[in-house]
A protein has these predicted regions:
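Short amphipathic alpha-helical segments
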Residues: 5, 23-26
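Short aromatic-glycine-(Arg/Gly/Cys) micro-motifs in beta-strand/loop hairpins
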Residues: 10-22
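A short, exposed loop/beta-hairpin motif centered on an aromatic-Gly-Thr core
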Residues: 25-36
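ATP/adenylate-binding site constellation spanning eukaryotic-like Ser/Thr protein kinases
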Residues: 21-24, 42
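Short, charged, surface-exposed hinge/linker loops at domain edges
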Residues: 1-6, 35-70
């Protein structure tokens, strides 16, 4: 089974970009560019998923992961 994570992007007043993985509450990251914010939040999401797998908090649905920037 595969899981697709949605990434929402928003530009802050100071010019930085914030990216958030909608399906993983609290998983958000800043970047100077959209691409940097996306890369940062993808890396963080993978860490969260790895931690959940390591602690048996996630099922097999995390075996195939896809990211889609909105």
């Amino acid at each position: 089974m595969s899981v697709a994570f949605s990434i929402e992007l928003e530009q802050e007043i100071d010019g930085r970009w914030i990216a958030e993985v909608v399906e993983l509450p609290g998983v958000l990251a800043y970047g100077a560019t959209q691409q940097q914010a996306i890369a940062q939040v993808q890396a963080l999401a993978l860490r969260v998923v790895a931690d959940r797998l390591e602690h048996d908090e996630a099922g097999r649905e995390y075996l195939d992961i896809t990211f889609a920037a909105a």
